Regions:
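Substrate-recognition "cap/lid" segment bordering the active-site pocket of phosphatases
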Residues: 85, 113-165, 170-171
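Conserved phosphate-coupling serine/threonine residues in phosphotransfer and NTP-handling enzymes
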Residues: 14, 110-112
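N-terminal helical cap/lid subdomain that shapes the substrate entry/recognition surface
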Residues: 2-98, 102
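Small-residue (primarily alanine) positions within well-ordered alpha-helices
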Residues: 25, 107-109, 152
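Small/polar loops that bind or transfer phosphate-bearing groups
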Residues: 18, 45-46, 108-109, 167-168
């Protein structure tokens, strides 16, 4: 087995504990207009890909996935204000520093938008600890498709057997 030379992190659910915050925001926003929605019915949103999000939400809300519905969902998501240092996992900063001190490359491969990624890393003051940052919005296929990981490894100049991926998803 070759030694690990790079560590690639997911962001939501790994670096930041964002899923409960996002889920609660969406639930409290949707419940008045869609009273049949329960918090439990929204659990599949945790870890959902960008491509699956709108079809899932349309089905959940019993709506057509059209421009008006997408506008409603975009407005809801834009209204979610999070102070990311509050949800940064406490072990993240020391771990990133230790990995860098060990001479390892550190990368981020997240399904989140570039804008969201930059906001999280900047607010948490960890941006400079990453050698490579990749947004899933730059790809045709979302996770679990390995395209984002292959691209990240290529940017790092690494082979799969030289990389460790830290991900919270079960796929």
């Amino acid at each position: 087995m070759k030694p690990i030379k790079a560590v690639i992190f997911d962001m939501d659910g790994v670096l930041i504990d964002s899923e409960p915050v996002y889920l609660h925001h969406q639930y409290t926003h949707l419940k008045p207009s869609y009273p049949w929605i329960t918090l439990e019915s929204m659990y599949p949103l945790v870890g959902i890909s960008g491509q699956e999000y709108m079809p899932f939400m349309a089905k959940l809300c019993r709506r057509t996935d059209d421009a008006a519905f997408r506008q409603e969902m975009d407005a809801m998501n834009a209204g979610c204000r999070v102070y990311y240092p509050d949800i940064l996992r406490k072990e993240v900063r020391p771990l990133l520093h230790e990995l860098k001190q060990m001479g390892l490359q550190v990368a981020l491969a997240s399904s989140s938008s570039r804008e969201c990624i930059e906001q999280v890393l900047t607010q948490c003051k960890i941006r400079e600890l990453f050698d490579c940052i990749v947004s899933g919005h730059e790809f045709t296929h979302s996770k679990p498709d390995p395209e984002i990981y292959r691209f990240t490894m290529d940017k790092l100049g690494r082979k799969p057997e030289e990389c460790l991926i830290v991900e919270d998803s079960t796929y």
